[in-house]
């Protein structure tokens, strides 16, 4: 079920009235659903733009069309038009399922480690142009990672590994006892912090 607040409905209705196109509504879709890059997209939709398989939600003065393939990802979504502490108003969309759900505790350790790496660790490393890939997860809970991008050859990779990645994985995935680096950092060609300049 998707909730759209009265304020958001009023906001959309005014925008649609300004466009002056008969039958215009708003289409909601999930982009890159089930991934860390997932996002919700809202756009005007004229009747000719619709494919016919959208879910239609009647709102005050317009229809919200949800792209059929996006419906499972938008379950529980909330659309609101809020006033921020600065006084500015902003449309917000909260879609708790859009990035997928963490694997259940019954899932393999490999699945749980990969999910945390892709959904929690890599988005943080991306701010430095870096990433890590899970190379192996041993039966006794040792995770072997390979750094890439700005982390490949970075002088702070050891700190990132021990204080960031290992701490996160050990805290989020029961059974992980250590995290090790399998990267040949000497071959990194664009490190965020060159190894010879790291403190």
Curated annotation (Swiss-Prot):
This is Fe/S biogenesis protein NfuA. Pfam families: NifU. HAMAP family: Fe_S_biogen_NfuA. GO terms for biological process: iron-sulfur cluster assembly; protein maturation. The keyword Transport does not apply. GO terms for molecular function: 4 iron, 4 sulfur cluster binding; iron ion binding. Keywords: 4Fe-4S, Iron, Iron-sulfur, Metal-binding. Homodimer. It comes from Xanthomonas oryzae pv. oryzae (strain MAFF 311018). The keyword Metal-binding applies. It comes from the Bacteria. Its cofactor is [4Fe-4S] cluster. Binds 1 [4Fe-4S] cluster per subunit. The cluster is presumably bound at the interface of two monomers. Involved in iron-sulfur cluster biogenesis. Binds a 4Fe-4S cluster, can transfer this cluster to apoproteins, and thereby intervenes in the maturation of Fe/S proteins. Could also act as a scaffold/chaperone for damaged Fe/S proteins. [4Fe-4S] cluster binds at residues 151, 154. Belongs to the NfuA family. InterPro entries: Fe/S_biogenesis_protein_NfuA (IPR017726), FSCA_dom_sf (IPR034904), HesB-like_dom_sf (IPR035903), NIF_FeS_clus_asmbl_NifU_C (IPR001075).
């Amino acid at each position: 079920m998707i909730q759209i607040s009265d304020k958001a409905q009023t906001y959309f209705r005014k925008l649609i009235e300004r466009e002056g196109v008969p039958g215009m509504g708003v289409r909601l879709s999930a982009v890159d659903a089930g991934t860390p890059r997932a996002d919700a997209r809202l756009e005007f939709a004229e009747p000719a733009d619709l494919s016919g398989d959208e879910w239609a939600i009647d709102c005050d003065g317009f229809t919200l069309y949800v792209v059929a393939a996006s419906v499972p990802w938008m379950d529980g979504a909330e659309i609101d038009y809020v006033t921020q502490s600065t006084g500015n108003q902003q449309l917000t969309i909260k879609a708790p399922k859009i990035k997928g759900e963490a694997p259940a505790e019954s899932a393999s350790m490999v699945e749980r480690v990969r999910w945390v790496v892709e959904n929690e660790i890599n988005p943080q490393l991306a701010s430095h142009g870096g990433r890590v890939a899970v190379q192996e997860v041993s039966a006794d809970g040792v995770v072997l990672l390979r750094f890439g991008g700005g982390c490949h050859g970075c002088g702070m990779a050891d700190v990132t590994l021990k204080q960031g990645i290992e701490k996160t994985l050990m805290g989020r995935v029961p059974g992980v006892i250590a995290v090790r680096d399998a990267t040949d950092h000497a071959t990194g060609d664009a490190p965020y912090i060159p190894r010879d300049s790291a403190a």
